[in-house]
Amino acid sequence: MKIHRFFLLAVAAFIFISGPFAGAESDWLTDYKKAQQEAKAGNKFLLLDFTGSDWCGWCKKFDREVLLQSEFKNYARENLVVVELDFPRAKPQTSELRKQNRELAQQYDIVGFPTIVVLSADGQKLWRYDGYFPDGPAAFIAQLQKLRKG
């Protein structure tokens, strides 16, 4: 009986802990060409997140403190097409995805993680931020809103 109760408690804890992360990935694309099409169709900015999701401490912190926050997720859903360009060490990726991510990293001169690149719907580079963004989701959103205003 104790083992059964412990098992149920462990499952409940897993669901509780993983819940906030489940929705974040669903809005993020990994296919850059598809993201470009969506950005054009919706006249939205394209936010490229160059990350090392399974090893980069600053990337994980940025995800946790900015990108996974409901304030950012709500803003992104209405205003952005978000693309994760991941360079994992252990997480499996297709060869096509690795190739796409390497080519984009080269195109945008990515030398460290995290790096955010924001493009207009027509592909013009509007903003780049290298490293961890320390000021939280509200300040990050404010920066993105400045780009909209020109």
Please provide the spans of the model-predicted regions.
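Bacterial N-terminal signal peptides
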Residues: 9-18
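Thiol-based oxidoreductase modules, predominantly thioredoxin-like and allied folds used
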Residues: 28-29, 68-99
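A short beta-strand-turn-helix
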Residues: 28-46, 76
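Short pre-active-site segment immediately N-terminal to redox-active cysteine/selenocysteine motifs
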Residues: 43-46, 51-55, 112
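Conserved redox-active cysteine motifs that mediate thiol-disulfide chemistry
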Residues: 51-67
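Non-catalytic, surface beta->alpha helical segment in thiol-disulfide oxidoreductase systems
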Residues: 65-67, 103-150
